Amino acid sequence: VLVLMGALAWWMRAPWPRTALEWLHIGVSGVLVHGVYLGGVFIAIGHGLPAGVTAIVVGLQPVLTALGAGLLLGERVRPTQWAGLALGFVGVAMVVAHKVAASASGGMLLTMLLPALVALLAITAGTLYQKRFCHSFDLRTGSVIQLLPCLVVTGLAAYQFETLHVQWTGSFVFAMGWLVLVLSLGAVSLL
């Protein structure tokens, strides 16, 4: 994603932030939103927390962000917005309720849940941080700036905690293609 977004930014001559402070703020928001959030989600699932339970935990992000926006940014959340957030959360809960029940009956451990909670706090903090300190930036160059420190952070974490051995199976290649092309580039293009 980093290479593709960098090439796109260069090819389209996208504007880059002018000050080191802008780069720093965009980088910090990127580490929180991309590195810590996604890392926490994948670690939680890797430790055995079902994807549905992980989804319900990080599905609280809009609610926490709305609370934080009111408390930290002085934004007012209207009652209709709270109702929409509540309906969305209820919808997610209904879809994954059976998985939550199965995990709880199987003895859900804090070690499984903790990375998902860290991911929730990271995506919330990153969203609020970006709203507060990254007022406007080009999505092409901003994505590059957000992903550069993530490469360093996740690279160091992988070096420390992983085997660095990749099994190049068809399933792995398809999953990586989906994560890179559809989820990452697709999500950025929707912004």
Where do the language-model regions lie?
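Helix-helix packing/entry segments at the starts of transmembrane helices
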Residues: 38, 53-60, 127-152, 180-191
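Hydrophobic residues within alpha-helical transmembrane segments
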Residues: 24, 28, 32, 60, ...
